[in-house]
Design a protein with these regions (language model features):
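Acidic-leaning, charged glycine-interspersed low-complexity segments
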Residues: 103, 113-162
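Residue-level signal for secondary-structure boundary sites
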Residues: 63, 102, 163-167
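Short, cationic low-complexity segments
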Residues: 79-80, 172-183
Length: 183
């Protein structure tokens, strides 16, 4: 089963912008927040004194899909249109580089759970993404780059992502099936 990741990725980017107080289409957001490269060994390295945030969304290998069905049609209409919601567990991996790496990681960790209009949690919830409360504190590391050191903060947040699948219409019990009788 294949699900498009784009709407979820857009919602995560928007939530990061809300956490950091940046406009979604701002130049600062585009320079600061990046999706992780598929081949990290070939990824360009930002300057040591520049802040940058890389992130990726990985499905939890121990994730068993949980499905629920919802029937939005009122009773007695004769048709049932069933929407099935499948929930999968994901890990949101965030790696912050630069002098303010720890501050950014802590800010994302604390702000991601704020609710209300325009706040990160609502942005995620509207896209069917639900952060699991109480993530661990970010791990602070120092990477050697040549003869210099780069500050790094790693943060992992567990998410439940809900996908919507529209099932076909089915006849209700109220509408009698067509029966052909041959003699």
């Amino acid at each position: 089963m294949f699900f498009s990741k784009k709407p979820h990725h857009t919602a995560i980017f928007d939530a990061f912008c809300a956490c950091l107080g940046l406009g979604r289409g701002s130049r600062e957001a585009a320079a600061l927040i990046h999706e992780a490269y598929a081949e990290p060994e070939n990824a360009p390295r930002p300057p040591r004194n520049r802040n940058v945030i890389y992130w990726t969304l990985l499905q939890d290998p121990a994730s068993d899909p949980v499905s629920t069905a919802y029937n939005p049609e009122p009773a007695g209409t004769g048709r049932n249109s069933v929407t099935v919601y499948t929930t999968l567990k994901y890990q949101l991996i965030i790696v912050c580089y630069g002098p303010d790496a720890e501050e950014y990681a802590l800010r994302i960790r604390s702000m991601l759970y704020l609710d209300g209009s325009g706040f990160p949690r609502r942005i995620l919830r509207e896209a069917g993404i639900y952060p699991v409360p109480d993530p661990p504190q970010p791990a602070i590391l120092y990477e050697e780059e040549g003869s210099l050191w780069r500050k790094r903060a790693d943060l992992t947040i567990s998410l439940r992502v809900q996908y919507e699948i529209q099932a076909g219409e089915r006849n209700s019990i109220i509408s009698a099936p067509v029966v052909n009788i041959y003699r």
